[in-house]
């Protein structure tokens, strides 16, 4: 038997990721140097830690039920143990001794009961015996109710979804091919190509165009690193991806510290390597000439998309950078676990603005479509709205009861293709709710409450009339943004990490923890 600390750490790290503890997984991964291990994550199946724990538990259960000579205890059911009980010292000996004593008592009691029954039966008539032993079927209790009619249900009640809103199976396409959890997915902005990124160290481009011969085809983008003068497969997670505005190039960030740019046909165009650790976020600017990345090395980098050259590295955060977003083609904002938000501009050697006010890690930031307001969300359970015109936040929105994981602006209002509709902001939280906000008034207009687990992703339809949400409860919900009502619902086969709409607004893509990618035809 061989067990190394690297192997144990990797299984714990994967368990934290699969269970939705993204920040804990990140911290643990850094402290245990997961990125420096030689473990090939593509060979490790989902739920590996749980599986090996279950096997160990079954071994202890079987051990309790076996005599020292190897024979099984007579009339002994296999013990059902909890994990904590199983690790108690001497639990095997304690349970075996307790069962032996219980068995002796049961045998003595059975002998006494049998003797008493025989003596009693000798003095009873056949009719009396019949009354003493009524038929077993549908036994009646003293109040006339049937036994079992009101059994106690110790399981949580499953969520009930109205059948009218359930998306039928023929409207859902499940795409399989990834060998590990799929963290991210994104539609090409001009065609029905869906990109997905996974813990199996690959990204895939799925062709769902109507003319793709009736089925979906996939391109597998395998990440390689240079070792000893040769390209060898990387075994690190794909953490982020983003299409450029004309849909010709796909940029991806990885846990191996490299960003890569691929063509829509699956050809590697360039590899961007200057980060000293995993990349957590990356975005194209609108013009399509620069790619922006954020990493665990506390820096953000602007890359020339055509040459692959790092134009400028911004070392202003004091802890890992978690998210970035462009304000315009030259200026961007970044957030970090250091609780700060920096606004930086290409060519400037210091932040042009720094926003402080959050009291915990800042998970996500998003500029509104006009570039005037910046929204941020944090583990401090608040959502804040900032303006370049002032240092203090414009709104400090407090309603969620747990960490807020992500936020999205609606594609409505000024500077959008829907200028006559008012702008909204959506927030998704670990408290299992999604909230819609009127940013001008600073109030919550709707609280969407059908999910039962943390909500990891929200996305507005292109017209802003609908909002998709994805949760670790395996459900994708589609909501009406004006009424807050649930209009469509789909239960997948794994926890949902990401949801996204195609450009026409008639399909929703979702990526899941079991390695599946589903496409909902609305």
From Swiss-Prot:
Q: Where is the LisH domain?
A: 4-36
- Tissue expression from the record: Fetal brain and prostate. Expressed in the cochlear spiral ganglion neurons, and in outer and inner hair cells.
Q: Does the keyword Ubl conjugation apply?
A: yes
InterPro entries, A to Z:
Ebi-like, G-protein_beta_WD-40_rep, LisH, WD40/YVTN_repeat-like_dom_sf, WD40_repeat_CS, WD40_repeat_dom_sf, WD40_rpt
- Positions carrying N6-acetyllysine are 102
Boundaries of each F-box-like domain copy? 41-86
Q: Which GO BP annotation is one of this protein's?
A: regulation of transcription by RNA polymerase II
Protein location: Nucleus
Domain of life, per lineage: Eukaryota
Keywords (A to Z) from UniProt: Acetylation, Activator, Deafness, Disease variant, Isopeptide bond, Non-syndromic deafness, Nucleus, Phosphoprotein, Repeat, Transcription, Transcription regulation, Ubl conjugation, Ubl conjugation pathway, WD repeat
Glycyl lysine isopeptide (Lys-Gly) (interchain with G-Cter in SUMO2) cross-link, chain position(s): 287
Question: Residues bearing N-acetylserine?
Answer: 2
Cite a GO CC annotation.
histone deacetylase complex
Q: Which Gene3D superfamilies match?
A: 1.20.960.30, YVTN repeat-like/Quinoprotein amine dehydrogenase
Which GO molecular-function terms appear in the entry?
A: transcription corepressor activity
Positions of modified residues (Phosphoserine):
130
WD repeat spans: 177-216, 233-272, 274-313, 316-354, 357-396, 399-447, 450-489, 491-521
Similarity remark = Belongs to the WD repeat EBI family.
User: Looking at the record, which disorder is this protein connected with?
Assistant: Deafness, Y-linked 2: A form of non-syndromic sensorineural hearing loss. Sensorineural deafness results from damage to the neural receptors of the inner ear, the nerve pathways to the brain, or the area of the brain that receives sound information. DFNY2 patients show bilateral symmetric hearing loss ranging from mild to severe, with onset in the third to fifth decades of life.
Q: How does it assemble?
A: Probable component of the N-Cor repressor complex and some E3 ubiquitin ligase complex. Interacts with NCOR2.
- Domain note for this entry? The F-box-like domain is related to the F-box domain, and apparently displays the same function as component of ubiquitin E3 ligase complexes.
Described function: F-box-like protein involved in the recruitment of the ubiquitin/19S proteasome complex to nuclear receptor-regulated transcription units. Plays an essential role in transcription activation mediated by nuclear receptors. Probably acts as integral component of corepressor complexes that mediates the recruitment of the 19S proteasome complex, leading to the subsequent proteasomal degradation of transcription repressor complexes, thereby allowing cofactor exchange.
Q: What is this protein called?
A: F-box-like/WD repeat-containing protein TBL1Y
Q: Which gene encodes it?
A: TBL1Y
């Amino acid at each position: 038997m061989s067990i190394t600390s690297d192997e144990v750490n990797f299984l714990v790290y994967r368990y934290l990721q699969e269970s939705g503890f993204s920040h804990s997984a990140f911290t643990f991964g850094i402290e245990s140097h997961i990125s420096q291990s030689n473990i090939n994550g593509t060979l490790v199946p989902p739920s590996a830690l749980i599986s090996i724990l279950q096997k160990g538990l079954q071994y202890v259960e079987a051990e309790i039920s076996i005599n020292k000579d190897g024979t099984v205890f007579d009339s002994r059911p296999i013990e059902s143990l909890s994990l904590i009980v199983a690790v108690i010292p001497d639990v095997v000996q304690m349970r075996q001794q307790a069962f032996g004593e219980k068995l002796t008592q049961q045998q003595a009691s059975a002998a006494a009961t049998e003797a008493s029954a025989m003596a009693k039966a000798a003095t009873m008539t056949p009719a009396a015996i019949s009354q003493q032993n009524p038929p077993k079927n549908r036994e009646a209790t003293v109040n006339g109710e049937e036994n079992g009619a009101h059994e106690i249900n110790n399981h949580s009640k499953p969520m009930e979804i109205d059948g009218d809103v359930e998306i039928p199976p023929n409207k859902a396409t499940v795409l399989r091919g990834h060998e590990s959890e799929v963290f991210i997915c994104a539609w090409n902005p001009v065609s029905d190509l869906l990109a997905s990124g996974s813990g199996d160290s690959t990204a895939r481009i799925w062709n769902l165009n109507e003319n793709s011969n009736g089925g979906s085809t996939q391109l597998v983008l395998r990440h390689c690193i240079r070792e000893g003068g040769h390209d060898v497969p990387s075994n690190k997670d794909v953490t982020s991806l983003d299409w450029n505005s004309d849909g010709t190039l796909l940029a991806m960030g990885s846990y191996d510290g490299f960003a890569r740019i691929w063509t829509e046909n699956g050809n590697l165009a360039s590899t961007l390597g200057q980060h000293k650790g995993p990349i957590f976020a990356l975005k194209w600017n609108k013009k399509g000439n620069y790619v922006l990345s954020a990493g665990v090395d506390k820096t953000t980098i602007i890359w020339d998309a055509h040459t692959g050259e790092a134009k400028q590295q911004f070392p202003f955060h004091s802890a890992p950078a978690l998210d970035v977003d462009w304000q315009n083609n030259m200026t961007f904002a970044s957030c970090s676990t250091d609780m700060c938000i920096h606004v930086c501009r290409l060519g400037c050697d210091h932040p042009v603005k720094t926003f402080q006010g959050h009291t915990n890690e800042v998970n996500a930031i998003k500029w509104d479509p006009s570039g005037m307001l910046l929204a941020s969300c944090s583990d401090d359970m608040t959502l804040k709205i900032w303006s370049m015109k002032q240092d203090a936040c414009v709104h400090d929105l407090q309603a969620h009861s747990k960490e807020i994981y992500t936020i999205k602006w609606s594609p409505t209002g000024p500077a959008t293709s829907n200028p006559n509709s008012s702008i909204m902001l959506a927030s998704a939280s670990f408290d299992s709710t999604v909230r819609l906000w009127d940013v001008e008034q600073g109030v919550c207009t709707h609280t969407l409450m059908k999910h039962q687990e943390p909500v990891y992703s929200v996305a507005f339809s292109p017209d802003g009339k609908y909002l998709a949400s994805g949760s670790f409860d395996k459900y994708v919900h589609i909501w009406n943004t004006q009424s807050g009502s649930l209009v469509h619902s789909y239960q997948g086969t794994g926890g949902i990490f990401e949801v996204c709409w195609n450009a026409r607004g008639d399909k929703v893509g979702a990526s899941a923890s079991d390695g599946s990618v589903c496409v909902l035809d609305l």
